[in-house]
From Swiss-Prot:
Expressed in the rhopalia. Present in both the large and small eyes. Disulfide bonds: none annotated. SUPFAM superfamilies: ADP-ribosylglycohydrolase (SSF101478). Signal peptide: none annotated. Keywords: Eye lens protein. InterPro entries: ADP-ribosylglycohydrolase (IPR050792), Ribosyl_crysJ1 (IPR005502), Ribosyl_crysJ1_sf (IPR036705). Belongs to the ADP-ribosylglycohydrolase family. J1 crystallin subfamily. GO terms for molecular function: structural constituent of eye lens. This is Crystallin J1A. The keyword Cytoplasm does not apply.
Length: 322
């Protein structure tokens, strides 16, 4: 594969991840599966849903969820610094989500939905440690932020040999948890394969076989090959919430359906629950296989920072460290 093709796939992964997140957010965190699926299974265009169904917070259509927003912060950091710098990334993260920002607003499950963006509790706790300079400031929980936010890092460092180390550093800023790190590293290796080699039906098997043996591989393999289930049923089976391994298993199951970008994102939307991080992952994996032309231009235009992320992704793709 030519260098230009790899750069386009890196760009596609970034844009595909963030656009998928924005397309999903109006129906993020809807856990009444029966009602939700009945309403959406026959809806031909569930993306950017005009009715905001998220029961936890209200925000503008086309904006990013907390998962996409972390992805965006990392993207901006990498472009502005021409690479990853842990201290500068921690500073940028704190400035974006910390005191005085739109995310630093009272939120209580007794008063829902909140008006404005949501900040997960483990992020709030991590911010307190970031301020002290702790490089492993994250909370010890296994959460889906780990893989949902790192696509720009993979796009920049695919093929460099530095990916595992940088992924661990980024993840432990918010999630100082081994399962979170290993999940993110596997997500990164699979995305790296797609960026460097394009479509490959054997990609998952190859990456899994080359991944160091640990206790999580069977969980990923089980979900990926669970072809008898629809993605909606797989999400119910493995877990529709934000925790790992279930959230990641739902994303793996979806990417093995061999659907195009639009169909994959729509499938993820219709499966409900904590679907924004799954959309981030699926959007990156699928867009990296098909290239930037697979992402509908009208989806990009409906994303509030669509043009900005395209420009950042273009700049980052020219800085790939391979």
């Amino acid at each position: 594969m030519s260098s230009d093709q790899a750069k386009d796939r890196a760009k596609a992964a970034i844009v595909g991840s963030l656009v998928a997140d924005a397309a999903t957010q109006p129906v993020h965190w809807v856990y009444d599966h029966n009602r939700f699926y009945e309403n959406f299974r026959n809806k031909s265009e569930p993306e950017f849903n005009s009715e905001w169904l998220n029961p936890y917070y209200r925000y503008d259509n086309g904006t990013f969820s907390i998962y996409g927003e972390q992805n965006y912060v990392l993207l901006k950091h990498l472009v502005e610094n021409k690479g990853f710098n842990l201290k500068k990334y921690m500073d940028a993260y704190y400035r974006h989500f910390g005191p005085g920002t739109n995310y630093d607003q009272p939120q209580s499950r007794d008063r829902l939905p909140k008006q404005g963006p949501w900040r997960n509790e483990h992020i709030t706790r991590a911010l307190n440690k970031i301020q002290s300079g702790d490089q492993r400031s994250g909370t010890d929980v296994a959460e889906c932020d780990s893989y949902a936010m790192i696509t720009p890092l993979v796009a920049m460092y695919a093929g460099s040999g530095q990916l595992d180390s940088y992924v661990e550093q980024v993840v432990r800023v918010t999630l100082n948890n081994d399962r979170s790190v290993r999940t993110a590293q596997f997500f990164a290796k699979l995305l790296e394969h797609y960026i460097l080699h394009g479509r490959d039906p054997e990609a998952f098997r190859k990456v899994l076989n080359n991944f160091p043996d640990d206790q999580y591989k069977f969980e990923w393999q089980k979900a990926y090959y669970d072809r008898d289930l629809s993605n909606n049923d797989a999400v119910r089976k493995y877990g529709s919430g934000c925790g790992l391994p279930g959230n990641f298993q739902g994303a793996l199951h979806c990417v093995n359906r061999n659907e195009d970008y639009v169909s994959s994102v729509r499938t993820t939307i219709r499966s409900g629950g904590c679907n924004c991080p799954r959309a981030c992952g699926v959007g990156a994996w699928v867009a990296a296989q098909y290239g930037s032309q697979c992402i509908p231009s009208n989806w990009i235009s409906r994303t509030s920072r669509g043009n900005e992320i395209v420009q950042y992704a273009e700049q980052l793709s020219k800085m790939m460290k391979k």
